[in-house]
């Protein structure tokens, strides 16, 4: 009897354990079913989103890349997990656009330039630049008549020419200092004496009040007292010059904004000056040999005829005729089917209308156009290729086809 009771108890314990294990298995099965349903819902949701994207205009979606192949991991990121839906992305984009538009409007209102402000800017630049030119470009050792003539020349010349002359002066001064480091103290003493004498002598000869001239000289050259070498640095000169111009203007503009505005309206070539003279062309050729057709900024500066570096480069190309031997590249067109048009529209709606290299990759992977392109390439002989030198650019052809399809659909809707 005792043995039978023990066996019965053991069987009861085993039965309880089995029941518990079965309950756990049932719960696991339920959880698995729930997970499968959630996955099915998520897949259906993403499928519907892709359908909506294909029907709408192109939007940007970040594709995950692995060995130069795009796959369905575009909906998954390792750090973040599943990225937000397209609706959330569109909301974020709208808010960013609103903020950017507000910022643009605010900046435009803050930095608005009127015609009066621009005229005043040109006047202040002209006056202050001529003061600096009288200080830097007129030597102390010259006679009184020569100084007056130089001052007249400075007053008649344009600001662009004065800037280039001051830059050349700084370059020469720096070159001399590299060779003669021992004579720095003597040169600085002579220039400091020029501050007091040069401006005062000009004022006496030109019948201008002496007290005003002295005040202006003190205001302009107040920074020379602390540093001796800093006044012969063009960068420091430009900073001080444009800071002074911005202080004199009534409109609250920075020195950089004043400089940009003056360069935009002042430093462009006149319509009358488009034709190049023989002297300019000869000088340009000499300077291009000197600088080995590279440093076009220095070439334009040494020309000293208000020519920009880009115009100097273009003129040099016209003279040497560098681009005559190169034949024009001809674009071959690809024929499209109706099915290919649909594929192209879907791909552009997913990838976007800017990354045409990706569009080309996917279109070629569908094996729709590649067979025709290969046939057309094999039909061409080797000698015909050398004569014609045709170039096939698939990206441009896909882009053109997509734009034509969009224009056709828009016309149909209208």
UniProtKB/Swiss-Prot annotation:
One of its GO terms (molecular function) is DNA binding. This is Myb1 protein. Its main location: nucleus. Residues 242-266, 268-320, 328-381 form the Myb-like domain. It is found in: Nucleus. The keyword Transcription applies. PANTHER family: SNRNA-ACTIVATING PROTEIN COMPLEX SUBUNIT 4. The gene is myb1. Keywords: Activator, DNA-binding, Merozoite, Nucleus, Repeat, Transcription, Transcription regulation. GO terms for cellular component: nucleus. SUPFAM superfamilies: Homeodomain-like.
């Amino acid at each position: 009897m005792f043995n039978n009771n023990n066996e019965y108890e053991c069987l009861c314990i085993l039965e309880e354990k089995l029941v518990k294990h079965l309950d756990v298995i049932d719960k696991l099965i339920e959880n698995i079913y729930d997970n499968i349903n959630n996955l099915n819902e998520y897949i259906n949701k993403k499928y519907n989103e892709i359908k909506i994207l294909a029907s709408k205009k192109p939007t940007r979606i970040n594709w995950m890349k692995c060995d130069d192949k795009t796959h369905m991991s575009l909906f998954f990121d390792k750090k973040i997990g599943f990225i937000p839906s397209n609706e959330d992305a569109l909301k974020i984009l709208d808010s960013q656009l609103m903020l950017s538009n507000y910022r643009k409007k605010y900046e435009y209102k803050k930095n608005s330039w009127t015609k009066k402000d621009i005229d005043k800017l040109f006047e202040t630049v002209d006056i202050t630049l001529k003061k600096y030119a009288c200080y830097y470009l007129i030597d102390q050792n010259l006679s009184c008549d020569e100084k007056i003539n130089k001052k007249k020349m400075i007053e008649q010349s344009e600001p662009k020419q004065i800037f280039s002359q001051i830059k050349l002066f700084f370059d020469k001064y720096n070159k001399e200092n590299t060779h003669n480091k021992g004579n720095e103290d003597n040169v600085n003493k002579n220039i400091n004496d020029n501050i007091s004498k040069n401006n005062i002598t000009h004022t006496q000869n030109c019948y201008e009040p002496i007290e005003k001239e002295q005040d202006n000289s003190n205001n302009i050259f107040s920074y020379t007292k602390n540093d001796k070498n800093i006044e012969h640095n063009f960068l420091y000169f430009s900073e001080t010059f444009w800071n002074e111009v911005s202080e004199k203007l009534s409109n609250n503009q920075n020195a950089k904004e004043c400089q940009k505005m003056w360069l935009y309206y002042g430093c462009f070539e006149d319509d009358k000056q488009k034709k190049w003279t023989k002297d300019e062309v000869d000088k340009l050729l000499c300077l291009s040999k000197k600088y080995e057709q590279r440093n076009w900024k220095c070439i334009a500066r040494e020309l000293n005829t208000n020519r920009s570096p880009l115009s100097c480069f273009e003129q040099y190309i016209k003279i040497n005729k560098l681009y005559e031997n190169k034949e024009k590249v001809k674009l071959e067109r690809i024929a499209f089917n109706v099915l290919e048009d649909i594929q192209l529209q879907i791909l552009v709606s997913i990838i976007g209308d800017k990354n045409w290299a990706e569009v080309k990759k996917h279109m070629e992977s569908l094996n729709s156009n590649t067979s025709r392109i290969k046939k057309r390439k094999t039909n061409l002989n080797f000698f015909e290729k050398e004569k014609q030198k045709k170039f096939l650019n698939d990206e441009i052809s896909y882009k053109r086809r997509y734009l034509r399809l969009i224009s056709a659909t828009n016309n149909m809707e209208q």
